[in-house]
């Protein structure tokens, strides 16, 4: 098993190159639900944290109340893949929401974007009640480059 310090930079690099991922949660009956979202990952050399600016919809709230976990699966046409299985929690404090809003705005495209300019009703700023922030704390990571898949190499994995 690989150490977090070895896999996290490779995961962040690949996730940020692919940008969009399928995020899956489960409902109270154990059925999966997926949606395509746009996390931004921060690696400080010790901790890896993912952030998603999103809406706190009734479905997302119910799923995370039932099971506070999410799976983030990235795929590129080259068959590069990476996966983060995470504890997921809502973050409501305005200071953190403001920091992440500005981070998304200041990060170069295609990873960065202006959350207030994408047309979601009510997304006028980080203090807006319709803007929610989801924090992801991985407990499992997996990275596999397409070229390694073709050569029969196994994925690099980490688990907390």
Task: Describe the function of each predicted region.
Residues 1-18:
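N-terminal leader/targeting segments and the immediate start of mature chains
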Residues 2-3, 81-160:
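Charged, gly/pro-rich active-site loop segments
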Residues 13-30, 70-74:
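A short, Trp-centered hydrophobic/proline-enriched beta-strand micro-motif
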Residues 19, 48, 84-86:
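Structural detector for hydrophobic anchor residues on beta-strands
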Residues 22, 49-51, 142:
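General beta-strand recognition
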Residues 36-38:
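Conserved beta-strand in the GNAT
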Residues 40-79:
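A short mixed-secondary-structure module that forms the rim of ligand-binding clefts
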